[in-house]
Amino acid sequence: MTDKTEKVAVDPETVFKRPRECDSPSYQKRQRMALLARKQGAGDSLIAGSAMSKEKKLMTGHAIPPSQLDSQIDDFTGFSKDRMMQKPGSNAPVGGNVTSSFSGDDLECRETAFSPKSQQEINADIKRQLVKELRCVGQKYEKIFEMLEGVQGPTAVRKRFFESIIKEAARCMRRDFVKHLKKKLKRMI
């Protein structure tokens, strides 16, 4: 027996670990350490530090004189002050004046792309929210009634909407709420 204990003490490679044990710290501990490292080194990284220092210099206005700032902007865009196109890295103009090619049709196309939602989309959103509220535990009927008032369209659409919500409320075992909805439906008709 003493030979085995001496062998284990001398040669740790023969010792088997349990599957749960590992050399690295636990997942939660690693996450905490990573979070602490991020908090401590938030402004210490090369990229963040250089960007922050440039931002601070630009905000204070002490780092770059305005004349150099204009030339740097021109280098970035490729245009000089006389609107001539330039090659990057040189100040020699390439030639020709650059003009804008916007027309009124382009602006109209962009305006129509941001049209408001249709009645059907609005009603579908309201229905999703209503079903979500119905499935929640509790009696928050005021919020549901406010959403039902937001339904858009003719009376027939509103009637179908109320009927579908009544069915959903019955399915969710909300008998008292079904009674309230039926009363509102009768008043609406």
From Swiss-Prot:
InterPro entries (alphabetical): INT_SG_DDX_CT_C (IPR029307), Integrator_subunit6 (IPR051113)
Known tissue expression: Testis specific. Expressed in cancer cell lines.
Source organism phylogeny: Eukaryota, Metazoa, Chordata, Craniata, Vertebrata
Disulfide bonds: none
Superkingdom of the source species: Eukaryota
Similarity comment: family membership: Belongs to the CT45 family.
Organism from which the protein derives: Homo sapiens
Record-given protein name: Cancer/testis antigen family 45 member A2
